[in-house]
């Protein structure tokens, strides 16, 4: 690693770390490495507002929204604040490649990491994927020439100041996290902020051309490179088995654009894409019984993901769709309109938003069942007819589960234990 860690300059030595999750714990580790005194402020255990005047720096975890009173209090008292990513970035000079987008961030981050590794570079993926950058830096980090591939969520991007990626890859944009950002424009501007901080090239999914027009921001800068539409690369994409889904086709098209611009040879690119293993709980078939199939897309937590799954599976027989979960301020009418455009036979509503959507059941073209919880879904499946059961819920898991992983694992267990009738 670069052994000359540079602690951020503050007027007072005490660092206030807000949040005791992964980011907060990582920031604390880095403070210890830098010999900076700190205290962790956990909202779940703090009954009173902290005394901000004592801090020289406040490091906020991503969960603190823009209108959180503690953020506002830090601003009112003129205490410098930083994201965990900025705090870590102040301690090294390594190049950073950022990856953001409504969907596809994690897949692109993992592919990009493996691509650069296969090209002979020292590389590590960090950020929103669960590997905390501050903790990595505190534990030694990469050598000065190593590259960090940093997955950046909109929560992290909105407050970035000093992290300047060498390149940024932006997959796509669709409504999400409206309850956190306040409105769609704020959500877009959080993502776009990352592009403005980028030092060299911004690689964008083709669909972002329309997005930039919608928000009237320039899309013709020399530093901005768009991937071609996936449809123009059909012959090239067909060689990769994972490219059955529209979302993955667009991801691969973006990676290809990046690789060609940086002169990574075609053989290395092809090898990387061929060996790539999709992260768990992204759209994949988890069981087949004759022509009946079961699909897990528990990570599909917004309308854009649902539409991508619908587009990928629309030709399969007798579609049964599991929809619902925790809400984030979504327009429920958008889900109704989208599902009505596809040949879905039955919609099984679950969770918090499932109850809300049940009140609009008559607006769906498909048959609607209020299953409430995942185990109940399997009680309603056809007994003498093949079907396609899809968990692509469009909403978070937090109303009934700890994570989308836990939701997906339960679904796959239910599917494994499912005993079909002789006619399925």
Regions flagged by a language model, labelled:
Residues 1-16, 20-34, 38-43:
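Hydrophobic, well-ordered beta-alpha structural blocks that scaffold small-molecule cofactor pockets
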Residues 6, 11-14, 30, 240-344:
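Nucleotide phosphate-binding/pyrophosphate-handling subdomain across enzymes
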Residues 13-14, 25, 29-33, 47-56, ...:
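Phosphate-binding loop of NTP-binding sites
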Residues 16, 39, 124, 348, ...:
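Conserved beta-strand positions in the Rossmann-like core of class I SAM-dependent methyltransferases
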Residues 40-47, 233-240:
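Adenosine-cofactor binding site in Rossmann-like domains, unifying the SAM/SAH pocket
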Residues 41, 203-206, 320-323, 343-352:
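Short internal beta-strands
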Residues 333-388, 423:
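C-terminal helical cap/extension that packs against the catalytic core
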């Amino acid at each position: 690693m670069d052994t000359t860690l540079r602690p951020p300059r503050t007027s007072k030595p005490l660092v206030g770390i807000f949040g005791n999750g992964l980011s907060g714990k990582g920031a604390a580790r880095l403070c210890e490495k830098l010999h900076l005194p700190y205290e962790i402020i956990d909202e779940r255990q703090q009954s009173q507002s902290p005394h901000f005047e004592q801090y020289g720096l406040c490091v906020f975890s991503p969960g603190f929204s823009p209108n959180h009173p503690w953020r506002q209090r830090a601003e009112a008292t003129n205490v410098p604040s930083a994201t965990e990513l900025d705090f870590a970035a102040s301690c090294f000079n390594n190049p950073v490649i950022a990856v953001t987008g409504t969907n596809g961030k994690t897949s692109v981050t993992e592919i990009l990491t493996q691509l650069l590794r296969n090209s002979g570079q020292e590389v590590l993926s960090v950020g929103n994927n669960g590997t905390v950058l501050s903790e990595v830096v505190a534990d030694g980090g990469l050598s000065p020439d190593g590259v960090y591939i940093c997955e950046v969520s909109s929560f992290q991007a909105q407050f970035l100041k000093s992290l300047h990626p060498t390149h940024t890859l932006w997959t796509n944009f669709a409504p999400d996290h409206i309850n956190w950002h306040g409105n769609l424009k704020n959500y877009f501007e959080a993502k776009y902020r990352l592009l403005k901080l980028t030092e060299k090239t911004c690689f964008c999914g083709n669909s972002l051309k329309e997005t930039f027009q919608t928000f009237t921001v320039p899309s013709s800068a020399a530093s901005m490179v768009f991937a071609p539409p996936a449809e123009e690369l059909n012959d090239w994409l067909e060689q990769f088995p994972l490219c059955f889904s529209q979302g993955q086709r667009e991801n691969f098209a973006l990676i290809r654009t990046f690789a060609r611009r940086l002169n990574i040879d075609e053989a290395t690119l092809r090898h990387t894409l061929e060996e790539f293993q999709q992260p768990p709980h992204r759209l994949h078939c988890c069981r087949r019984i004759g022509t009946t199939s079961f699909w897990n897309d528990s990570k599909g937590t917004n309308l854009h993901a649902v539409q991508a799954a619908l587009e990928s599976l629309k030709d399969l027989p007798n579609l049964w769709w599991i929809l619902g979960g925790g809400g984030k301020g979504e327009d429920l009418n958008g889900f109704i309109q989208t599902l009505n455009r596809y040949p879905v036979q039955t919609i099984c509503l679950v969770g918090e938003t499932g109850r809300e959507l049940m009140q609009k059941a008559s607006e769906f073209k498909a048959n609607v069942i209020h299953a409430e919880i995942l185990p109940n879904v399997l009680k309603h499946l056809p007994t003498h007819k093949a079907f396609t059961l899809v968990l692509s819920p469009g909403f978070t898991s937090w109303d009934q589960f700890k994570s989308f992983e836990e939701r997906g694992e339960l679904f796959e267990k239910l599917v494994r234990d499912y005993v079909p009738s002789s006619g399925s």
